[in-house]
């Protein structure tokens, strides 16, 4: 009976994480009609490359794993010549209980901004996280 109780507890945590929203959103807020080149990957998935026009976004919802190790890495590049770019961790699960977080990224002229909602860690208001690499 104890094993069944433990199984049901772990299973309910796992299911809860898959019911709530977990994902990344990347928004192109660049000026001068600059498209944004994007490619993201995790241990199991590759997204892109994709081109995001100014004013548009790309949303990827996914399921965080039960081990608490889900991570997405992304590369963003500004068009037309791709001189300005950045490689970064776009989503990181901190524990097996850390499900349901949305990481909202904004590509702007002066850098890349992040707003986090949900998950175990405190929500984060929009703030600049990365500068562009030249």
Curated annotation (Swiss-Prot):
UniProt key word Signal: yes
GO terms (BP aspect): rejection of self pollen
Glycosylated residues (UniProt): 87
Keywords assigned: Glycoprotein, Secreted, Self-incompatibility, Signal
Pfam hit, one: Self-incomp_S1
Subcellular location: Secreted
Signal peptide from the UniProt entry: 1-21
InterPro entries: Self-incomp_S1
One cellular component term from this protein's GO annotations in UniProt: extracellular region
Family in the record: Belongs to the plant self-incompatibility (S1) protein family.
Species lineage: Eukaryota, Viridiplantae, Streptophyta, Embryophyta, Tracheophyta
Record-given protein name: S-protein homolog 31
């Amino acid at each position: 009976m104890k094993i069944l109780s433990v199984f049901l507890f772990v299973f309910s945590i796992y299911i809860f994480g898959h019911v709530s929203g977990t994902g990344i959103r990347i928004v192109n807020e660049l000026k001068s009609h600059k498209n944004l080149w994007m490619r993201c990957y995790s241990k199991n998935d590759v997204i892109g490359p994709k081109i995001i026009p100014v004013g548009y976004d790309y949303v990827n919802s996914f399921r965080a794993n039960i081990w608490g190790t889900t991570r997405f890495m992304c590369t963003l590049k500004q068009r037309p010549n791709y001189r300005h770019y950045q490689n970064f961790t776009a989503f990181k699960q901190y524990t097996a209980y850390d499900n349901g977080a949305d990481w909202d990224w904004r590509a702007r002229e002066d850098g890349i901004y992040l707003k986090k909602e949900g998950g175990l860690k405190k929500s984060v208001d929009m703030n600049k996280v990365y500068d562009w690499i030249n």
